[in-house]
């Protein structure tokens, strides 16, 4: 199904409507076509946003479309794993936006002198997954504050949503989400992820997930992703499956950068053993260092006690 054929963009449903779609095959060759599983429409200020969960032979993914007042459209494509990370990032932007005070007249005047364009970003993050990058910038202009989301695609094969063939280079796509609608948008996204983001099809790499197929359908169930926060860093653990087997993607995220490694399932035991061994060794090292510190601190006072005791015995 082409992007323009999205059920929600064809006008189905009113503002805030939720439309689950039939999940059956689409006739001959239906397994190779894109199926629409659900649609959600949001009206925020003078814009319409459509969130469509779709599925094709490569897996399940999310299409986000922005339709402006003049009918112009911009679209982003996210795998369900990236959509979950995007949902978490939206939570960070919502918290940051809530802490911002109103813009001063001087700031708005400065923006007007610069041609009314957006000032520097109030907060920025980016996500990287395979050949796609997503840049998130909370910005401000005379019309207010908004979250600009830009997607770029590097050279390589077509992604979840199709697009140019192998070796093609897609131009960047950008949507601008008014800050007042961040919570509503995040909640709608979270509902779609909860309903469609953790099933076999998305993890198995294709509809139906047949046993032993190239999409890795032997694994009908995989562990859920999780994350931990340490100081200013967040670590995401996402289990996935492709034609090569099951893997764990570990992503390290800071405000200024993001890095990730992929660990195949057959190496998990070795990685886990190495982590446990280093944790035990560091615990022993820390205990030895504490013992030495206590000895140095208590050595002088202990010696003084013994001398005082000897003097008492002599008396």
From Swiss-Prot:
It is found in: Nucleus. Expressed in muscle cells and in the liver. Keywords: Acetylation, Activator, DNA-binding, Methylation, Nucleus, Phosphoprotein, Repressor, Transcription, Transcription regulation. The modification Phosphothreonine is found at residue 34. GO terms for biological process: negative regulation of DNA-templated transcription; negative regulation of transcription by RNA polymerase II; positive regulation of transcription by RNA polymerase II; regulation of transcription by RNA polymerase II. The modification N6-acetyllysine is found at residue 270. Residues 305-315 have a biased composition (Acidic residues). InterPro entries: PUR-bd_fam. Signal peptide: none annotated. GO terms for molecular function: DNA-binding transcription factor activity; DNA-binding transcription factor activity, RNA polymerase II-specific; DNA-binding transcription factor binding; DNA-binding transcription repressor activity, RNA polymerase II-specific; double-stranded DNA binding; mRNA binding; mRNA regulatory element binding translation repressor activity; purine-rich negative regulatory element binding. Transcriptional regulator which can act as an activator or a repressor. Represses the transcription of ACTA2 in fibroblasts and smooth muscle cells via its ability to interact with the purine-rich strand of a MCAT- containing element in the 5' flanking region of the gene. Represses the transcription of MYOCD, capable of repressing all isoforms of MYOCD but the magnitude of the repressive effects is most notable for the SMC- specific isoforms. Homodimer, heterodimer with PURA and heterotrimer with PURA and YBX1/Y-box protein 1. Interacts with MYOCD and SRF. This is Transcriptional regulator protein Pur-beta. The lineage of its organism: Eukaryota, Metazoa, Chordata, Craniata, Vertebrata.
